[in-house]
């Protein structure tokens, strides 16, 4: 393994990296950073969770001259969540060098951003629409930009941002360095590389390095109407510290988070229809641990990097295998272990096989727990906690009452009563979940997407009137007259911008109504006993 000290970074950046607890570079970091420090253009192919933010962030920050009061680098990201997350990460890494980082995105008052831009940030992290808006307002000038980063370029293609990206790249000096990161390399991304990059170094993390060995992956065959009871039993048995539950649509997220609360679980949901303030509030509570279960759509969860997520539950199977990889990448981060569960209805076995082909890994089958198993699982967890308390805590103040209880009752009865008090009893509160149609495999596994984004994600073809593809439902965020690309750059029919102060997304259709493809048949899977999770 390569250490960060071997990569030629400045002392201030090494100080930040070491204070964050990192010593060894990941493969994408070890291969990217030396070339980037030499000023070379980079094409990096890597999935989420491989450390690519630091791979481009460290050389980007290393290049900044903090004595200059101008924007020297821009990072373009597909979603506001990812822009915020990248901005936070760059701030941590650049803290000791005193680099000023400014995220700009839809959903935030643009006048507030204009005031912040007047304070001369060194690096801008933002979504394409909002960056271009500031360029055209003359509130963001890029004449001194030396480095441009395109993060998750294929996602920006799928969301319809290619024209915006080209417009931004045209506005920066020709001598700039470009660092482009993308999980896949469809033709439109290759054309951008050919047009705006000079002899780029192509760095690709091998598939075996992105299959997330720290994550235990299980699938459960379960009927649609039984999913919720299976989920609650798993939550009771596994008692996750922090869990993310993925639903395919906004309706599903709303109904599922409400149902979990009715059954006594601290849960909240996020999706594209929430205001930015509400979404940030929910995420803050989740990070702080005041809610234990976050229910999310694929779109809303893009770019989330929340430490301590122990479990990911795929309540609805994702529309494509790449989304599955992004989903489970929310756990098992920074060397920690994680558990991912995938609920598969009888008609979705073909999609399960597509996912396994993409990840190059067979999932273990887990039997859906019964009610009795859920109760026993809870009790065993409680017993472990009691044993840990006996071994590690001072119980002197509690023994007198304990002795009095044992004079009147036998020890087994006392322990049984304690277990009963601490065990969550079965809850029969009625809940209502609208059934979602199954995702039926279209055959042939995952396909590379072309220039129009292709594919279906979150169950919506999402095409505008002129026939251009919105791609994966992660949303071009356009309605029929072309509005709402990233929740802030709204266009009316004549092309003028409607500058919404709230910048909020008006109905992300990509998280909308499910629309399955045609079946290519069902595959039979070998039955295995359920491992302990």
UniProtKB/Swiss-Prot annotation:
A motif (DEAD box) lies at residues 151-154. Disruption phenotype: Longer lag phase and slight reduction in growth rate between 20 and 45 degrees Celsius, no growth at 10 degrees Celsius. At 15 degrees Celsius the unusually long cells form large aggregates and are curved at the pole, with incompletely divided, thickened internal membranes. Decreased growth in the presence of H(2)O(2), diamide and at acidic and basic pH. It is found in: Cytoplasm. One of its GO terms (molecular function) is ATP hydrolysis activity. InterPro entries: DEAD/DEAH_box_helicase_dom, DEAD_box_RNA_helicases, DEAD_helicase_CshA, Helicase_ATP-bd, Helicase_C-like, P-loop_NTPase, RNA-helicase_DEAD-box_CS, RNA_helicase_DEAD_Q_motif. Transmembrane segments: none annotated. Pfam families: DEAD, DeaD_dimer, Helicase_C. ATP binds at residues 46-53. Residues 214-374 form the Helicase C-terminal domain. Residues 524-533 have a biased composition (Basic residues). Keywords: ATP-binding, Cytoplasm, Helicase, Hydrolase, Nucleotide-binding, RNA-binding, Stress response. Induction: More highly expressed in lag than stationary phase at 10, 30 or 37 degrees Celsius. Induced at 10 degrees Celsius. Encoded by a monocistronic operon. It catalyses: ATP + H2O = ADP + phosphate + H(+). Residues 428-533 are annotated as: Disordered. Oligomerizes, may be a member of the RNA degradosome. Belongs to the DEAD box helicase family. CshA subfamily. This is DEAD-box ATP-dependent RNA helicase CshA. It comes from Bacillus cereus (strain ATCC 14579 / DSM 31 / CCUG 7414 / JCM 2152 / NBRC 15305 / NCIMB 9373 / NCTC 2599 / NRRL B-3711).
